[in-house]
Amino acid sequence: MKKLLPLSLLALAGLVPSLTTAASAAEKDSRVFELRVYYAAPGKLDDLNARFRNHTLKLFEKHGMTNLGYWVPLDNPDRQLIYLLAFPSRDAARQSWKDFSADPAWKEVATKTEANGRLVTKVESTYLTATDFSPAIRASTADEPRTFELRTYRTPPGKLAALHARFRDHTVGLFRKHGLGQFGYFTPMDKDKGAADTLIYLLVHKSKEAAAEAFTAFRADPAWTAAKAASEKDGPLTLPAPDGVKSVFLKPTDYSPAK
């Protein structure tokens, strides 16, 4: 009778899924995330940041919102503040926002901080779920300042699953190999926000220059060129520029949990 190989040896031999892959799939983050982009009125970005620093984050926490990260673009002509929240569910998010908006403490803060005019001219909100290949999404920090990168990919019709497969099977590991820190991978929940064709993710770098060096090495890696060619034998997985891939480099605010 043949002896059975231990599961760990079978995994190493590629005969069964690896234990880490199985664990990551089993531990997929079930929370709902919200990516919000605020456009500050001219001359009001500092005031908006002060309101978040001194009041809003605490009120968000009071009403069950998890603050993950707050950033401003390195190049910020539109005076954007970008942040990421987490909730137990979409219903929980609705209730949290309802309770926050009705809180007398928030109403008082809003009135005082907008005595000389509104701080925000436009708000964009996208609800997200984590992909099954996303790392654990948490508000990590580092001893040295870091630069974040928000990347948005849009696919041709019917190609999102193939793009996910390429990230799951190849890109995530190659990013790690080339020193690209990975904060989280997401897909929008709503059709009008790109549920069928959009992948959104956040990377973490030592600097914008370090990001450029890492991506140069990544793109030159034979493992990447082979994976890209194989995955695109039936056509590209992202739309042509400038719509297919968008990148925004971000600096954490001084009050951001993730830095």
Regions found by a protein language model. Give the residues of each.
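Bacterial N-terminal signal peptides
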Residues: 7-18
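Positively charged n-region of N-terminal signal peptides that target proteins for export
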Residues: 1-4
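Short S/T/G/P-rich N-terminal loop/turn motif that feeds into the first structured element of a domain
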Residues: 19-226, 230-259
